[in-house]
Amino acid sequence: MKAMYIDAPGQVSIKDVEMPVRKEGEVLLKILYGGICGSDLGSYRGTFAYFDYPRIPGHEFSAEVIEADENNAYGIKPGMIVTCNPYFNCGHCYSC
């Protein structure tokens, strides 16, 4: 599969990457649409000091569930269209 990388500030490339292998308790998703948000733009511009490179941007997306545990606690099933809440808030860092 293909992935867009920000290799360094101002440098973007498309690379071949291995298909991820789903582990127990995880879902495998096929990304349908991805958004570009301020942190993605900041990583491209090099304005966020805590980002490492290279990085794959795109934490705001919609996707189709390809694989999921059969009896997961959330009722997620293959074929469902999903999105995620990509935010983990510590309440103490610069971003928070």
Language-model regions, residue ranges each:
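Cytochrome P450 core scaffold surrounding the K-helix E-X-X-R motif
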Residues: 39-45
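Glycine-rich beta-strand-centered segment in the early N-terminal region that forms part
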Residues: 20-34, 47-94
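Short aromatic-enriched loop/helix-cap "lid" or pocket-rim segments at secondary-structure transitions
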Residues: 42, 94-95
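Extreme N-terminal starter segment of soluble prokaryotic enzymes
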Residues: 1-2
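Short N-terminal binding/cap micro-motifs at the start of the first secondary-structure element
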Residues: 11-14, 38-39
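Generic structural detector for well-ordered beta-strands
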Residues: 16-18
